[in-house]
Design a protein with these regions (language model features):
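Long, compositionally biased intrinsically disordered regulatory segments in eukaryotic proteins
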Residues: 1-83, 87-88
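Multi-bladed beta-propeller domains
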Residues: 86-115, 145-167, 192-211, 243-278, ...
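Non-catalytic accessory segments flanking enzyme active sites
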Residues: 115-120, 130, 151-152, 213, ...
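Residue-level detector of Asp-centered blade-edge/turn motifs that repeat once per structural unit
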Residues: 121-123, 174-176, 218-220, 284-285, ...
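Hydrophobic beta-strand positions that form the internal "hydrophobic ladder"
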Residues: 126, 179, 224, 289, ...
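A flexible loop/linker signature enriched in serine peptidases of the S9 family
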Residues: 130-140, 160-166, 181-189, 206-212, ...
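Cap/lid segment of the alpha/beta-hydrolase catalytic domain
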Residues: 297, 467-592, 599, 633, ...
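Active-site-proximal cap/loop segments of hydrolase catalytic domains
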Residues: 548-752
Length: 752
């Protein structure tokens, strides 16, 4: 991590001892050792012994200097700015937990944050999508030129989002000076750039029943190849294919029922016959196409196949064959090297590791590149996910997860040796690689996530765009403590614990703080230690938070994911309860004032915990599942057989669905709850929240329900985000008996 020459003047006069001392104080011994990848540094936790090692090791000193410069930039960047409070007093005020005044307001989270999404590269430019809550959640593609100029590529009201698989992803790509994208309003594909008329996007497709994603350009044939979902017969019966969409055909005409200009293009079906397709990737010479496919009842992280076909003269595919994968092997992100060698990630050994295809025809096989107990892949909830790419020399630049943290690295193309690239980020997603640089979304523990560009020669990181225009004083930031705790069956599970932090306040003497248990979505998702405004919202008010990576979460290998097979509503709930018990037993939290919250699948875990366990005093379900039978009958195609693996085949296992549905056992409920739901949610229909509310109200327990117009599965609008957070805080205040600081609109709570 050698500092750039222009930055070395910042090191002038700073001794190595001073650097190490300050770094240790900032990061801690273990974290510092991990960041600079020096094992002996961790093993010799004293400054004198570390200095002795560093002075004998120039490359290690370079890493320390680079990290020291980053730390100084972070300190300057995270200094009190827009939302800083006055200097904390020498003696903090004693006040009830939950009532502390916080600089992290719901309005700030809703209005000053954006959702950073897909990244794309073209030459030396970087582009990314950002969802803007203040613009009704509209998604805009922003491009940064080589000279640092930012500009929006899609004009209002165009919203770059595809609803393929409902969760979308892979909604745009760059083609020379053009942007090709899916528009949320009609799900058509558009182009804007040289072919545009008066700067207006031109429609490439015509049917509103089609959805497109994960497109790649076939320049030689003047077309794009994309995944297409045909919803002509409804969401549950959507037909997936790979199609080629011409960029040359058609006549331009002004559309009358949609914004923009319509450009009628022909579409050629290239591959069909599977329930799902993703990740079409064209060999650099255009002669072969690779893609992924899978079928019910599998999800892509359960089992998928990697296909390879030759591209014929007329553009069709011939000799299509499976080269990797199967019903119990998950393949992730096929990519071609610059030399035309197909690479991919597979979990055949229990971990998503990288492979390259060697041999021809029936003799083709996957050669492991760097076997290790780490994840070079992710649960493919969205299109376009990326964990690796190739630099200008053919080396692999990759991001992998190990022990819950991301690490950037380079795999030498000739020796297959893995070399760590030191960065200050604990999560790295959507990695895209150029000739001598890479870009990714990086999350650190003390600052909001950001689009980051890293120079692969100097290893210097540059933040191109932060997810937040506001930053909180680091004195208010609670950093994650990774915990491993015992759970059912003699097993261990993982979580991230956040203690309450607010330098202006302290809780009543001898009283541990209340606890909020967070259960992530998916359930095949993961909690990361990256800075999260929503977590800081609670910790700065006096709550402790534990974000649980229950059995079934990604990032810990296939066996850990498989713990949830047939056990959803059991294993996840056990782990949530046991995480809370572990913290209570060590004295970190008050078990008599504990809540559980979660969204989507995490909302189901929340409702199950409140129904089938008696540990928590209240909970908050954000678009959570209360009726598994209703979900099995009324959902979209992508998840329509998901429950086969989590619960059992439907309807053969109908009895188990009923046994695991909280809606059927409201007589067991003894804890209040608040339910928050979008009225346009297709993944978890609003009828589920209404039914749960009616049942809890009839039971006589305190319950609140907030329905939000225009919201889908996950809240996107600023007003909704703010109202949901404040409503939940108000609810906890009424249940736990504290008055939140500031002015919050009351919530109607039945039976209270």
């Amino acid at each position: 991590m050698t500092p750039a020459p222009q930055a070395r003047n910042l090191l002038h006069g700073v001794t190595l001892e001073a650097m190490v001392t300050e770094l240790v104080a900032y990061f801690g011994w273990d974290d510092l050792g991990e960041r600079i990848q020096i094992r002996s540094f961790n093993l010799e936790p004293s400054i004198p012994s570390s200095l002795k090692f560093l002075r004998k090791t120039p490359w290690a000193r370079d890493k320390v200097e680079g990290l020291y410069l980053y730390m100084q930039r972070e300190k300057a960047r995270t200094a009190p700015r827009k939302i800083a409070m006055t200097t904390p007093p020498d003696h903090p005020t004693t006040a009830p937990f939950g009532s502390w005044a916080s600089p992290v307001s719901a309005a700030l989270i809703a209005g000053a944050t954006i959702r950073l999404g897909q990244i794309a590269l073209h030459s030396s430019t970087v582009a990314w999508s950002e969802g803007r809550p203040q613009d009704q959640g509209r998604n805009v593609v922003v491009q940064r030129s080589a000279d640092g100029v930012l500009r929006d590529l899609n004009p209002a009201p165009f919203d770059v989002r595809t609803r393929a698989h409902e969760y979308g992803g892979g909604a745009f790509l760059l083609h020379g000076s053009e942007l090709l994208f899916s528009h949320d309003g009609d799900q058509k594909m558009y182009r804007i750039g040289e072919a545009s008329v008066a700067g207006e996007p031109v429609a490439l497709t015509t049917s509103a029943n089609m959805r497109y994603a994960d497109a790649v350009v076939d320049s030689a044939r003047g077309r794009v190849i994309a995944v297409r979902e045909d919803h002509s017969h409804g969401s549950i019966d959507a037909v997936a294919t790979l199609v080629a969409i011409s960029l040359r055909d058609g006549a331009e005409q002004v559309g009358t029922e949609q914004v923009g200009t319509e450009h009628v293009c022909t579409e050629q079906v290239l591959a069909s016959g599977h329930d799902f397709f993703s990740t079409p990737r064209l060999r650099p010479d255009g002669q072969q196409l690779a893609w992924l496919a899978w079928d019910h009842p599998n999800m892509p992280w359960d089992g998928s196949t990697l296909w390879l076909a030759d591209v014929a003269g007329d553009g069709s595919l011939v000799d299509a064959r499976v080269v990797a994968g199967g019903p119990s092997e998950s393949i992730f992100q096929p990519e071609w090297s610059p030399g035309g060698v197909l690479h991919f990630a597979s979990d055949r050994t229990g971990w998503w590791n990288l492979y390259r295809l060697s041999g021809l025809g029936a003799e083709a096989s996957g050669e492991p590149l760097c076997p290790m107990e780490a994840e070079f892949g992710q649960a493919q909830w969205a299109f376009g996910m990326s964990c690796y790419g190739f630099d200008g020399r053919g080396n692999i630049v990759c991001a992998f997860t190990q022990a819950g943290r991301s690490q950037l690295a380079r795999i030498d193309a000739s020796t297959l040796q893995l070399h760590f690239i030191a960065t200050p980020f604990c999560t790295i997603t959507d990695l895209k690689v150029g000739a001598d640089f890479a870009a990714f979304i990086g999350g650190s523990e003390a600052a909001p996530s950001a689009v980051v560009r890293i120079d692969l020669l100097t290893q210097r990181c540059e933040v191109l765009r932060s997810a937040s225009s506001s930053e909180v004083d680091v004195a208010y930031v609670s950093r994650a403590e990774a915990i491993t705790f015992p759970t059912e069956g003699g097993l261990q599970a993982h979580a991230l614990f956040y203690a309450p932090v607010n330098p202006r306040f302290t809780g009543p003497p001898g009283e541990p703080p209340p606890l909020i248990v967070m259960s992530h979505g998916g359930p095949t998702s993961t909690a990361t230690p990256a800075f999260n405004w929503s977590i800081q919202y609670w910790t700065t008010r006096g709550f402790a938070v534990v974000d649980v990576n229950y059995g079934g979460s990604t990032g810990y290998g296939r066996d850990y994911r498989a713990r949830l097979a047939g056990q959803w509503g059991v294993v996840d709930v056990d782990d949530a309860v046991n995480a809370a018990r572990f913290l209570a037993e060590r004295g970190s939290v008050n078990p008599a004032r504990s809540a559980i919250r979660g969204g989507s699948a995490g909302g189901y875990t929340t409702l199950c915990a409140l129904t089938f366990r008696s540990f928590f005093q209240c909970g908050a379900s954000h678009y959570g599942i209360g009726d598994l039978e209703a979900l099995a009958r009324d959902t979209h195609k992508f998840e329509s057989r998901y429950l086969d693996g989590l619960i059992g085949p439907w309807p053969a296992a109908q009895a188990r669905y009923r046994e695991r549905s909280p809606i059927n056992f409201t007589e067991r409920l003894s804890s209040p709850m608040i339910l928050l739901q979008g009225l346009e949610d297709k993944a978890v229909p609003p009828a589920q929240a209404q039914a749960m509310f009616d049942a809890v109200r009839a039971k006589g327990l305190p319950v609140a329900l907030l329905m939000f117009e225009g919201e889908q599965h996950g809240f996107r609008r600023a007003a909704t985000i703010q109202r949901a957070l404040e409503a939940e805080l108000y609810f906890y205040g009424r249940i736990f008996g504290f008055t939140p600081a500031g002015s919050i609109e009351p919530v109607a709570i039945e039976n209270l």
